[in-house]
Swiss-Prot record:
Residues 21-106 form the Core-binding (CB) domain. It comes from Xylella fastidiosa (strain Temecula1 / ATCC 700964). PANTHER family: PHAGE INTEGRASE-RELATED, TYROSINE RECOMBINASE XERD. Its main location: cytoplasm. Belongs to the 'phage' integrase family. XerD subfamily. Residues 127-318 form the Tyr recombinase domain. Forms a cyclic heterotetrameric complex composed of two molecules of XerC and two molecules of XerD. This is Tyrosine recombinase XerD.
Amino acid sequence: MTLRTTNQRRQLARQQPPLLPEDATTIAHCLDALWIKHGLSRHTLNSYRRDLEGLARWNNGRAGPLATLTPPALLDYLTWRTQQHYSPLSNARLRSVLRTFFSYAVECGWRNDNPSTLLAHPVLPHPLPKALTESQIEALLAAPSIETPEGLRNRAMLELMYAAGLRVSELVTLPVAMLNQRQGVLRITGKGGKERLVPLGEESQHWLQRYLEQARPSLAADKPIPADSDGDVPLFINTNLKRLSRQQFWRWIKHYAALVGIAPNKVSPHVLRHSFATHLLNHGADLRALQMLLGHRSISTTQIYTLIARQHLQQLHAQHHPRG
């Protein structure tokens, strides 16, 4: 079975009927409440919105308003998604969104029960995070041409992402005020508004300094860089003085990977974060320290990287031990 690509899912969504006003209002109220209560990021809220609007459009009022749907209606929708080749991981995420949404509906008094709790939750496999080798990382980081302001900016972004293990959303939204060059640290606001301090190595500080002194003024054409809608001045900008998008950064990484002979389908912004974690563990980093650097709420999320490190040790043993 071939799973649907992102573009195919978007095209399918456009074929669905328009959102009913009552459902649109319900979704908006729920997202506002989630933002106030949990401080969810814009990216997470947009994901919630897409999932809830997808269900609402599919239902189109047939089984009643969105907030009143029953377990059979939800099961019908999940069955339809499976027939449309949505991935098990995507459907598992939808179940999580539905639990949150209907819990909010109960809090608001729109219903007395949470129908999503009656849905079966299949056990999903936990694929190991993909990481590049250290030599591949070195080649990828050196791929941008530093002769142009854009290339120098991209080099600094790649260096920073790998040095600090940032999520791509954290990188592109990073305010300049969160960089402390004197102490060589970043203050990162991660998922759920959780803050963490991340130290920077000499190499990433070198490229950041070059970006700030050479590329950033050139990209801004020496104009003052305005604050965004959140009141923050972005660290990384384009020629329109705006922060960069995740999609732009994704395309650049694919392009640079192809330039240095790495299969583009094996590279994504998150692969740099996985590589950061894997390489630290391979060199003896403490798991609790890695948890803090990555900004994970639970140590169990961080522990998956130990499996990759264990594989690395097994490979070394097999290659170099006389009885390997």
